[in-house]
A protein has these predicted regions:
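Hydrophobic helical h-region of N-terminal Sec-dependent signal peptides
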Residues: 13-20
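C-terminal motif of bacterial Sec signal peptides marking the signal peptidase cleavage site
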Residues: 21-25
Length: 196
């Protein structure tokens, strides 16, 4: 989907810049990953970067370890199975929406795979549970629901280290989104002691 056709020109530029700024604000240590900085930020934004990052030309970002992501996925699926909802899919994604762990329950339909990933990404990107974000996706004209890869339905939980959103746990497939949400929350509870 080409957002520049659907959003006013200033918003089409502001949304990617806001995403860059939000990503730069991530901080505190789960697993450190560095990547080359994209030359999109303005000089004013670059001037605000810590001196050590500016000298390196890279920024650090945190993500869950594979063991922690797997533990969250297993706990979320176990909760759904205990509730008689073993036909869901659980996805644990990093802040960029990259899948770190995924478990597909027995008889989970194909659409649950993408729904769980999108819910996890939406929670991670916005730093909030998707059940709390659903109201932002309503209205006339362009809304955040038009952002590609997002899904503003209950079932996504943000994973935070300190105040920084570093991942999301998404569950898709239960007949009620709040049941998906409860399973995702169980995944977060299982790893809460591992987050710094």
């Amino acid at each position: 989907m080409n957002l520049s056709r659907r959003l006013p020109k200033t918003l089409a530029v502001t949304v990617p810049l806001a995403a860059i700024l939000a990503t730069a604000a991530c901080g505190s240590g789960i697993e450190e990953n560095t990547a080359s900085a994209t030359p999109v930020a303005t000089a004013a934004v670059a001037a605000q970067a810590p001196a050590d990052q500016a000298a390196k030309g890279t920024v650090a970002s945190n993500r869950l370890t594979v063991a922690t992501a797997g533990k969250a996925a297993q706990a979320a699926l176990a909760k759904c199975q205990a509730d008689g909802l073993g036909f869901v899919t659980v996805s644990v994604v990093d802040r960029a929406g990259n899948v770190q762990a995924m478990l597909r329950g027995d008889n989970a339909a194909q659409h649950t795979v993408e729904a769980s990933r999108q819910k996890g990404y939406t929670a991670a990107a916005f730093g909030a549970n998707t059940s709390d974000l659903a109201g932002r996706a309503k209205g006339d004209g362009a809304t955040v629901a038009d952002l590609e890869g997002t899904l503003f339905l209950p079932g996504g939980v943000a994973v935070k280290a300190g105040n920084a959103s570093i991942a999301g746990i998404g569950v898709g497939g239960a007949p009620d989104g709040m049941a998906d949400q409860a399973c995702a929350a169980a995944g977060l509870d299982a790893i809460a002691g591992s987050l710094q």
